[in-house]
Amino acid sequence: MHRYRSHTCGALRPSDVGSTVRLSGWCHRVRDHGGVLFIDLRDHYGLTQCVVDADSPAFRAAEAVRSEWVIRIDGRVRQRPAGTENPDLPTGAVEVYIADLEVLGHAVELPMPVFGDLDYPEETRLRYRFLDLRREKLHANIMKRGAIIDSLRRRMREGGFFEFQTPILTASSPEGARDFLVPSRLHPGKFYALPQAPQQFKQLTMIAGFDRYFQIAPCFRDEDARADRSPGEFYQLDIEMSFVTQEDVFQAVEPVLRGVFEEFADGWRVTQSFPRIPYAEAMLKYGVDKPDLRNPLLIVDVTEEFSAEAVTFNAFKNLIRAGGVVRAIPAPGAASQPRSFFDKLNDWARSEGAPGLGYIVFEEEGGQLIGRGPIAKFVPAEVQAAIAGKAGLKAGDAVFFSAGTEAKAAGLAGKARIRIGDDLGLSDKDQFAFCWITDFPMYEWNEDEKRIDFSHNPFSMPNYDHKAFLALDPADADTILGIKAFQYDIVCNGIELSSGAIRNHRPDVMEKAFAIAGYGRDVLEQKFGGMLNALRMGAPPHGGIAPGVDRIVMLLCHEPNIREVVLFPMNQRAEDLMMGAPSEVTAKQLRELHIRLNLPEKSA
């Protein structure tokens, strides 16, 4: 028999009854039932109930065992007594009567238990992450993560993609988030950077003549943590393709993501054909460029209706005269809600920095749709009817309003849409609702600097005739601000999984694109000369995307925080409490790197 085990703790079944087995694992729990000890033995694969009584030579040793000790037991498999089976365990029909027990590893009193759903402070969980990972749910999340990555790899290979590995030590990027810098011992005063993404390398791979690239790529950015973003490092499914249109990228990526989500959906529905939503439409209908389509509510613009001469609600009319807009958020069935429902929404809007949410409640009176509420008296019946018609409202429904600059009105309306949908129970949560956001503006007006600037990705291809683009007058702001880019986001349940683009592979178009935004050729050469040089040597049309692996896993594990799907995450301050990183280094190490510290003075 093997030194430590003949079976794992999740393997035994009724067919093993009568067998002599050896198991090793952690003592999950010990229960003393008056001279009979029950030890739940746990390993990576599962849990088995083991039993020992005073008739066994192992009883004395078993009495000393405590939680989380690591032990080996030999014993015989037997059927559990009728009525004591545990249907929630794969091994729940059997138990092992212990004949021999060996302690392989003792455990001191633990700073946190490893069973149950008790929530412990983040600092404790991260400092003792190896204990936290023994907890069933977190352990399962990490295993699911590995299975998801395996599935992604398999599906990419089936789609004709080849896996590459790009450098981890590279040059610092002049754009984007802050780099993590690595000093060079051989080149004093110079630094490598950890890649924020393999963006330039994957494009260079296409220029090198490869066709379909992918990589489960580690990425490093010195930025603050969020619920859906780890500080420091994360992984993405990095993808690039040659000789493709935007639609080709969609057709390659959709089956991969749809297939992975269907494989791990646990019964949730998955969007079969991802809708394409133009950016402007998303901002109007959902108030955000990453809409949660599980919520059926659609925002509508009612600026024209509130501009009517007969409307006397001056708070909105004054905003409209100043260039603002009014957005309406429907609330189906909300007329039956108590006054507190409306008051809470108004209080919430004030907490968001808005003066409140005006609203109208619709009722039927004499066959007519009649509006009630604090602003209804300022809005004539014909305008109320027009608003109701545009928003698809009927008697028993309500509508809320958000007004201000287009950005502020859209932002508040988008948040209100989610809140109202949740409060009214309208959102269908048991699904993964995907969409593509397309047609991002190439440029935007920088109000602070009074000039045109890039709106999103400066390296994407303009969705504009190239000859006409090269001939554009930089002073023709109206035309330029109307240009769209071949940029796209993929969104699931209101979470942006990735941005992507068809790349600008033509140096002349790239130079013109930067010139329109006020960047001279010298700036372009200085910051991006290496990439420009490669583009001048025969670059194919190419494009790609990079869905975030951590966010995919977070969604499929139904976790609200990305920390719950990362093996050894940092805390919110980018500290590894378990390993003590970041840490000070020795003076000798600093001398070898020709580095002298100039630390800020500590405040008194």
Swiss-Prot record:
GO MF term (any one): nucleic acid binding
EC assignment: 6.1.1.23
GO cellular component: cytoplasm
Catalytic activity: tRNA(Asx) + L-aspartate + ATP = L-aspartyl-tRNA(Asx) + AMP + diphosphate
Aspartate, as annotated region: 199-202
InterPro entries found in the cross-reference section: Aa-tRNA-synt_II, aa-tRNA-synth_II, aa-tRNA-synth_II/BPL/LPL, Asp-tRNA-ligase_1, Asp-tRNA-ligase_1_N, Asp/Asn-tRNA-synth_IIb, AspRS_core, GAD-like_sf
One GO BP annotation of this record: aspartyl-tRNA aminoacylation
UniProt keyword terms in alphabetical order: Aminoacyl-tRNA synthetase, ATP-binding, Cytoplasm, Ligase, Nucleotide-binding, Protein biosynthesis
PROSITE patterns: AA_TRNA_LIGASE_II
Binding, ATP: R221, D222, E223, E496, G548, V549, D550, R551
Binding positions for L-aspartate per the UniProt entry: E175, R221, H456, R503
Positions of the record's site feature: Important for tRNA non-discrimination: H33, G83
Subcellular location: Cytoplasm
NCBIfam families tied to this protein: aspS_bact (TIGR00459), PRK00476.1 (NF001750)
Function according to Swiss-Prot or TrEMBL: Aspartyl-tRNA synthetase with relaxed tRNA specificity since it is able to aspartylate not only its cognate tRNA(Asp) but also tRNA(Asn). Reaction proceeds in two steps: L-aspartate is first activated by ATP to form Asp-AMP and then transferred to the acceptor end of tRNA(Asp/Asn).
Family membership: Belongs to the class-II aminoacyl-tRNA synthetase family. Type 1 subfamily.
Subunit structure: Homodimer.
Protein name, entry field: Aspartate--tRNA(Asp/Asn) ligase
